[in-house]
C-alpha cells in the first residue's frame, strides 16, 4: 500500500451532523487546522443523508432548558446525565437559529413565528439539511475534508491520543494522521441484529446501515470508558417502509390502535420503550396487527403527510400512492425495528464530562457516539459538536507539546491492514459472517425473533458465539479497499456486540421494557440499579463499572 502521513491540529472522525458543526465551530473561533475524515461523502453522509422533516429538540415558547432535561430523564427512567442534558439543552435554540441562517427552511406562521409540532419540535423542509451543512464546511477557513477515507483505529499511548489510522477506499492510500486533539463523531451502531426486512431489502432500516459503531469499537479497544450500552434503541416504525411514526403521531394526532380498533398506548405507557413494548404485547396476545389511526383525517392533512414524508422517507409516500389510498382511507400498520446502539436517542456511548471529553486524554465525543445524553436528535448533535469543538481548542491551547505517532505503531497498523489484501480464499465471506452475527444476536441477545427478550443463559451463548465469529475474521480477505472496509465494519460490529451483551448481563433488572427486557429479572430494581452501568476493556476482558447517578445541579468531572 502507498502510505501518507498528515499532521493537523484537530482530527474529526465522521463528517455527519456533530462532525460538521464541530468543524464550523473551530473554524469560527480559532485559527486551528481541522481535518475531517469521512468514509462516505459529507454532502450525503450520516443520519441526515436523506433529510428530515422536523427538528425534534427545541425549547419552544414558555418552556426552558430544564423542561427538556426533565422530559429526557423521564423517558429514560432516570438513567441519564443531567449535566450533559442541560449543557446540550441550553444550546438547542442557538444552533437552530444558526441552521436557519445557513439556509435551512423552518416553517413559520402568519406572525413569523416557528411552526411547532408538540412541545419540543419544529416543522422544517429538511430534505437538503445535510448539503447545507456540507456547503458551510467546504467554505470554512482552515478546514480540509478527506472523503472516502475509512478511519479504523486510534493511536493511543499512555491513555493519550496522538492521532488515528485509516485508508482511502478509492485511492488505496494508508494514512497516518497525527493530531493534537481528536473529535469522534461517527454515530451509533446499526446492523448488529437481524433487521425487519430480509435479503435485498435488508438495508431498509431505521438507522443508517453504514453506521457500524466504528467510534464505539475504536474507543472500546483503546480502553475508553463506555456507558449504558444495555439501553438499546428500538424504533416504532411504519411497517415495511420503516418510515418514522412521529410525523403521524404528532403531526395529525394518530393514536396507536390494535386490530380491534382499541387505543392501547395509554395501557402500557407513553415513553419510547413503552410504546414499542405495547405494540409487541398486543401482537403476542392476538390483538395484532397494530396501527396508527389515520382513517378519517382531512384532505389537507393527507396532503401534508404526503409532502412531509417526501422530505425524509419517500418510500412511505410512494406506498400510499401505489395503493391508491391516502392515509385518510387506511390506517398505517406499525412494527418495532431491530435494536440499535445510538446515543442520540438513548444514553449509550462514550462516558464523557460536560466538555465532551472522554476518558482518553485529547479525545472528545459528540452526537450519537457520546453517551449519557439521550433525545439529542439533530439540534442536540449540533450542540454537542459545538461543545466538543470548543473543548478541543481549549485543550490544545493548554498544552505545550504533543507526541508524534511512532514508526512502530504505524508499521503495526499497516501490517494489520495489508494482511487482508491477499489472494487466499477462505470457506466463508465477510457477508456470511455478518449474517451469522446478526442471527446470533437476534436469537440469543434479545432481537425481533424473541420479541426483544433474553435471559442470562441466552446471553452466555451469544457471547460465546460472537467470540467464535470474531476469531474467524482473521482469515478473511479483500480483493479491493471497499471490501477491506467491509471487513473493518464487521470487526467493529463484533466488538460492539460483545459490549452490548456484557451490559445486558450486568443490569440485573428490567427498567425499560423491550429496550432491555431481562426475563431472569423482570422487575425494576431501584435499590441496586438506579445507577449507570459502565464498562472498560482491561487485558482483553470487559470490566463492568457501576457508577452513581449525576443528578440535578451536580457536574461530573473525570477523576478515576
Q: Where on the chain are the PLM-derived regions?
A:
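Glycine-rich FAD pyrophosphate-binding loop
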Residues: 28-50
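Glycine-rich active-site loop/strand segments that organize a redox cofactor
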Residues: 56-88
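Glycine-/small-residue-rich beta->alpha transition segments that form the dinucleotide
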Residues: 40, 181, 185-190, 369
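Glycine-rich loop(s) and the adjacent beta-strand/alpha-helix scaffold that form part
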Residues: 184-243, 378-391
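Mobile, glycine/GP-rich and aromatic-enriched active-site lid/loop segments adjacent to catalytic centers
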Residues: 93, 100-152, 160, 228-377, ...
Amino acid at each position: 500500500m502507498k502510505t501518507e502521513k498528515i499532521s493537523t491540529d484537530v482530527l474529526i472522525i465522521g463528517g455527519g451532523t456533530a462532525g460538521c458543526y464541530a468543524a464550523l465551530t473551530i473554524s469560527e473561533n480559532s485559527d486551528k487546522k481541522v481535518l475531517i475524515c469521512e468514509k462516505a461523502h459529507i454532502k450525503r453522509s450520516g443520519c441526515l443523508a436523506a433529510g428530515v422533516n422536523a427538528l425534534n429538540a427545541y425549547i419552544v415558547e414558555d418552556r426552558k432548558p430544564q423542561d427538556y432535561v426533565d422530559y429526557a430523564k423521564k423517558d429514560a427512567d432516570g438513567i441519564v446525565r443531567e449535566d450533559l442534558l442541560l449543557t446540550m439543552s441550553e444550546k438547542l435554540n442557538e444552533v437552530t437559529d444558526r441552521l436557519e441562517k445557513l439556509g435551512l427552511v423552518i416553517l413559520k406562521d402568519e406572525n413569523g413565528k416557528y411552526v411547532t409540532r408538540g412541545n419540543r419540535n419544529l416543522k422544517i423542509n429538511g430534505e437538503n439539511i445535510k448539503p447545507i451543512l456540507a456547503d458551510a464546511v467546504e467554505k470554512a477557513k482552515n478546514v480540509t475534508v478527506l472523503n472516502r477515507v475509512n478511519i479504523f483505529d486510534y493511536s493511543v499511548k499512555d491513555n493519550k491520543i496522538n492521532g488515528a489510522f485509516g485508508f482511502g477506499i478509492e485511492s488505496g492510500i494508508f494514512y497516518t494522521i497525527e493530531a493534537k486533539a481528536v473529535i469522534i463523531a461517527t454515530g451509533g451502531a446499526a446492523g448488529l441484529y437481524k433487521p425487519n426486512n430480509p435479503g435485498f431489502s435488508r438495508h431498509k432500516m431505521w438507522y443508517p446501515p453504514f453506521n457500524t459503531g466504528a467510534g464505539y469499537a475504536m474507543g472500546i479497544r483503546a480502553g475508553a470508558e463506555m456507558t449504558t450500552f444495555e439501553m438499546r434503541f428500538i424504533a416504532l416504525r411504519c411497517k415495511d417502509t420503516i418510515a418514522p411514526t412521529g410525523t403521524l403521531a404528532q403531526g395529525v394526532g394518530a393514536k396507536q390502535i390494535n386490530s380491534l380498533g382499541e387505543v392501547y398506548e395509554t395501557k402500557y405507557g407513553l415513553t419510547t420503550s413503552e410504546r414499542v413494548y405495547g405494540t409487541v404485547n398486543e401482537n403476542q396476545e392476538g390483538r395484532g396487527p397494530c396501527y396508527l389511526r389515520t382513517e378519517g383525517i382531512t384532505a389537507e392533512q393527507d396532503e401534508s403527510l404526503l409532502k412531509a414524508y417526501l422530505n425524509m422517507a419517500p418510500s412511505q409516500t410512494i406506498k400510499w400512492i401505489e395503493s391508491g389510498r391516502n392515509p385518510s382511507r387506511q390506517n398505517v400498520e406499525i412494527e418495532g425495528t431491530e435494536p440499535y446502539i445510538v446515543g442520540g436517542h438513548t444514553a449509550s456511548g462514550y462516558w464523557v464530562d460536560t466538555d465532551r471529553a472522554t476518558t482518553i486524554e485529547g479525545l472528545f465525543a459528540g452526537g450519537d457516539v457520546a453517551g449519557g445524553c439521550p433525545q439529542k436528535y439533530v439540534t442536540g448533535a449540533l450542540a454537542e459538536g459545538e461543545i466538543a469543538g470548543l473543548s478541543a481548542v481549549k485543550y490544545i491551547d493548554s498544552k505545550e507539546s504533543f507526541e508524534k505517532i511512532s514508526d512502530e505503531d504505524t508499521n503495526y497498523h499497516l501490517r494489520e491492514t495489508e494482511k487482508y489484501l491477499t489472494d487466499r480464499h477462505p470457506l466463508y465471506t465477510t457477508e456470511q459472517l455478518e449474517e451469522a452475527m446478526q442471527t446470533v444476536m437476534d436469537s440469543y441477545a434479545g432481537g425481533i425473533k424473541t420479541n426483544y427478550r433474553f435471559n442470562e443463559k441466552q446471553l452466555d451463548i451469544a457471547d460465546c458465539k460472537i467470540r467464535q465469529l470474531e476469531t474467524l475474521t482473521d482469515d478473511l480477505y479483500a480483493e479491493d479497499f471497499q471490501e477491506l472496509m467491509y471487513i473493518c465494519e464487521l470487526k467493529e460490529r463484533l466488538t460492539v456486540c460483545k459490549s452490548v451483551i456484557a451490559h445486558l448481563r450486568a443490569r440485573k433488572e428490567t427498567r425499560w421494557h423491550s429496550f432491555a427486557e431481562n426475563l431472569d429479572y423482570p422487575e425494576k430494581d431501584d435499590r441496586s440499579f438506579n445507577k449507570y452501568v459502565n464498562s472498560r476493556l482491561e487485558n482483553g476482558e470487559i470490566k463492568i463499572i457501576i457508577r452513581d447517578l449525576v443528578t440535578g445541579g451536580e457536574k461530573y468531572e473525570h477523576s478515576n
